[in-house]
Amino acid sequence: MSDVPLVKVALAQINATVGDLAGNGAKIVAAARKAYAQGAQLVLAPELALCGYPPEDLLLRPAFMSACAAALEGCARELADLEGLVVVVGHPHQLGESGDVRSKSVAVQLRFNAASVLTEGRVAATYCKRELPNYQVFDERRYFASGRDSELPALVVKVGGIAFGILICEDAWFDEPAELARAAGAEVLCVINASPFHLGKLAEREERMAARARATGLPLLYAHLAGGQDEIVFDGGSFALDAAGRVGARAAMFEEDLAIVEVTPRSVRGIVADIPSVEAQAWAALVTGVRDYVDKNGFPGVILGLSGGIDSALVLAVAVDALGAARVRCVMMPSPYTASISWIDARDMAERVGVRYDEISILPMFEAFKASLAAEFAGRPEDATEENIQARIRATLLMALSNKFGSIVLTTGNKSEMATGYCTLYGDMAGGFAVLKDVAKTLVYRLAEWKNAQGPEIIPRRIITRPPSAELRADQTDQESLPPYEVLDAILQRYMEDDQGIEEIVAAGLPRADVERVTRLIKVNEYKRRQAPIGIRITHRAFGRDWRYPITSKFRA
């Protein structure tokens, strides 16, 4: 009979909501009870799972910190009857007079991103995160002190004969925290996480954690959040690696899961979920983001303008997958420039997905606006002013329906348009949530094709194949105002996500005139983007929390 100890560990992949201490605590307790019933001895809940991530300036409110402390104690009491079970919970920790972590600093209260060990009805120990990310969407140094300011350099907890070292997210991306845990006797590394999704992030995580496992010679368990929080999506995919960095277990992506992993000091074993395709991950992120933003904020449903174009068609498809057809309403608002095929395709799409579809002509309102402004505009030709009036009339109609019925307006503009300002302030930009804000136009087409390939074909073929147009004047197409989307999106990728300058982008083979124009448009339209609704982040550089450029600036790379 083998003398090698074996412990069942549960990775409690929950969908937390910021500020819902009771609800999040209940999810942690429920997951722990379910895991205990399956023989687990150790349960890992994600980073800041108790309060949700990111809590932002809630952390600066004393009442919030006090409530978090009380909720943690409450979880410990709720789990007291589960004999021998150890639960690790992520939460914010305020060091006060009754704190169980003593500060090396003098006469100041410190706030930490922490992980506490709950067992036998009490909070037995607390570890404080050492490495605080302060890039992209992260602002942790604004809120937290480093665990280096505590007297506990590492936390190792013995469960079932195995010593588990506790780390928090960014800690595992650096050498020192893991080495401190190993020096303290850890035989397995446990990393609790709140790591926002972007395309390619799961592979990046697994590669970095595999390198950490190999460097330390220790298995590594990675517990992660799932679900949406404002513009951020957490993709789940919690996993377990053996000491050689091989994946031995992986939870489902983009949904709550409880992964039970059999762990020894060298090996891990559990169910390994597949990794979806890039398109499937992008789709799941959009669906998750819409569903959780709408549901967590208590909206009864969504409303959007359906134009017969590909962007609004894709948003409609996402919304139906996220919420169900009964909670989605779309409105076609034709103008004198709306092609008959746009009407036909919009109605066809709405019928295919089974949503409520209404038509409201903007012609009477458009004519009234032009008549009211005729004296002021006398002698001046029609231009973008009249085009923008149409977009703003549509926004007024959608917002009126939103006010009357309570549904939130989904905007339908994409990242390529948002970058270049090819959108109307207080027009098509008006709404509560921008589904495609981080989806470039070329990816819009890929996702439309992917969605149809899953069957049944819900986006009419002509919507995908016809040239895109705002239909705000006769015979208008997007390419009259913008470079081809393949060129535009390649420039955006290099300029936004890779931080390349104009000369580097031109050297890569992209036309100088287009590069100069697009980068200028990005700069001069910053004021527009500041007034846009938030939208789902799916790349590692989105217009939102991780794009913080000044509006007034003379610099252009």
Residue ranges and their predicted role:
Residues K158-G160, L218, A243, S267-G308, ...:
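ATP/NTP-dependent adenylation/nucleotidyl-transfer catalytic domains that generate, transfer
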